[in-house]
């Protein structure tokens, strides 16, 4: 093989060492789709209830650096068609929308609503987008603690608190955001933009829970 993908943090060091000796690139990623599918199928035939082959122990979420905090943010939706075509003609510096996550790959129609979050980063927009890219984001999820918040799962097991809130109306919107994700195979997106002018964007990521 030319590449080995690893999704378990505990396995990373050992496999990376072996890969160097064999001249094989080792990539840390949670997107080991075929492997996880096979492990899940095996788990269905395993009678030990404690056997969770896809379970990863994650540390408590950490707040993002204060200097990266955006000016404001909001929940939004785009149709599957808009998500695929809306950003093609825009000169966005950071775009992460792999083909295997695009709505057509999941059999979703053009008018299906894909939930997302926009962060208006102001003067720090590009800096925030670069930081998010470096974390290798996987999903952006609502945690309904008190206060509630949106947590970015990234890398192999990292978790970052992007925003917090305790407003009941925002909490209801967050629950709707999560419900919509479940209707579209966990697909959602994160857009970082300087402001709401619609003229420029800093980065967009298509994510999946």
What residues fall within each predicted segment?
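Secondary-structure boundary/capping micro-motif
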Residues: 1-209
